[in-house]
């Protein structure tokens, strides 16, 4: 793995390594069968809804899985949150801006939006409360809480505006890597949810201290 600052072209070498890792992880994820993704996602959702960050949250910020891309499906967790009386919201993108829209039921509440992702059709914008939990998708994660996104920076920009809100990365087993080669602007995850459980990461900052 290239070392930052080890040579004049270290930046370009590292950029290429990140591009290669993103491509490899996306291809590996896309190779999973729909049944395999569904089975692993169901397990992940059970761990999410049993976790302390979820139980203490009043608002759950979810995401709609990319169809056919092998992305972990958190809709079962969103459905459970609604049954428990929690508020839920899903992202909607306009230009470079992402916001979360409240959803009161999962049927007929979405339409295809930016990047062919299903987006909510409602109009009520929700912002993270002090007790909110944001479920964060990604291409790859590492055990230190590092996250590699899709390259657009939408989540990093959004999460940077709410530094005290708990973030839980959601990953299939094939998305866990040794090192995502995080950049200074990449927002780390305080928790990771996988089919092995929900774990607190090694993130060392104020928002990592779960006082609830």
For every predicted segment, state its role.
Residues 2-6, 96-212:
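Conserved phosphate- and dinucleotide-binding cores of soluble alpha/beta proteins
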Residues 2-6, 10-112, 116-127:
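N-terminal active-site beta-alpha-beta segment that forms phosphate/nucleotide-binding
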């Amino acid at each position: 793995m290239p070392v930052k600052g080890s040579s004049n072209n270290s930046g370009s070498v590292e950029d290429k390594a990140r591009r290669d890792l993103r491509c490899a992880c996306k291809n590996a994820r896309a190779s999973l069968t729909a049944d395999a993704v569904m089975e692993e996602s169901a397990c992940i959702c059970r761990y999410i809804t049993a976790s302390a960050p979820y139980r203490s949250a009043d608002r759950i910020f979810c995401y709609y899985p990319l169809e056919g891309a092998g992305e972990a499906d958190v809709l079962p967790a969103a459905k459970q949150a609604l049954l428990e009386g929690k508020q839920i919201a899903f992202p909607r993108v306009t230009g470079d801006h992402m916001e979360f829209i409240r959803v009161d039921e999962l049927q007929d509440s979405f339409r295809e939006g930016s990047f062919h992702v299903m987006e909510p059709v409602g109009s009520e914008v929700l912002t993270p409360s002090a007790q909110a939990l944001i479920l964060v998708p990604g291409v790859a994660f590492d055990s230190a809480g590092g996250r590699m996104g899709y390259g657009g920076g939408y989540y990093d920009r959004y999460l940077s505006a709410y530094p005290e809100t708990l973030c839980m990365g959601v990953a299939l087993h094939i998305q866990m890597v040794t090192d995502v080669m995080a950049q200074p602007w990449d927002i780390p995850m305080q928790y990771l949810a996988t089919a092995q459980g929900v774990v607190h990461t090694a993130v060392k900052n104020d928002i990592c201290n779960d006082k609830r």
